[in-house]
Amino acid sequence: GREWLQNTFGITPQYSWAIDPFGHSAGQAQVLKELGYKGMLIQRVHYAVKKQLAEKQQLEFQWQTPVGEIFTHMMPFYSYDGPHTCGPDPSICCQFDFARIGKGKTWTGCPWGKMAVEITEHNVAERSRKWLDQVYKKAMLYRGKHVLIPIGDDFRYQTMEEAHKQFTNYQRMFDWIKVNVPSLSISFSTLSRYFDAARETNVPKLQGSFFPYSDREKDYW
């Protein structure tokens, strides 16, 4: 796949997005380092390990390998879907997965009973503050000044309608935040832009593998 991207588009990936393997080995980090990757993002790590690393602000680290180290970002919560990416409360974050507005597919509505709604001039202040509260809480788990908030899930962005819902509503909040919370810089971004900024952070060095995997008590995969 890497060679195909290079031969077809002249692009060589520099950052890895690995959100769904059930655990992560040190060999994975070594192979990516040998291939020239600058950083990697991982998600499925034992929930108790995540908790311990979050308490120490060690969810970003330099993963040590026999061939060098690679900057690694570990997502902090249960899953990589919309309800589990903006902050610690999925019942709130789900309200900002705007693909759930109106008719949809399997992701219609939120299982916590609080639905996503369109952002308007009448609710933008309240909605933005509620979203930012979650973002601030997530930021406390990391040492750096940059916060990564992925927007999506499995099988997403298959229609222009969904993309419009997501980007239009987030842009309305971003516009409000830029005016009313000028101390923050907020924008749509890419994984590479995030890593280029986050790598400036002084992070710990860790080694070893993240096995076995469990996402909740006694549920081992």
Task: Name each model feature, range by range.
Residues 1-221:
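Catalytic-domain carbohydrate-binding cleft regions of carbohydrate-active enzymes
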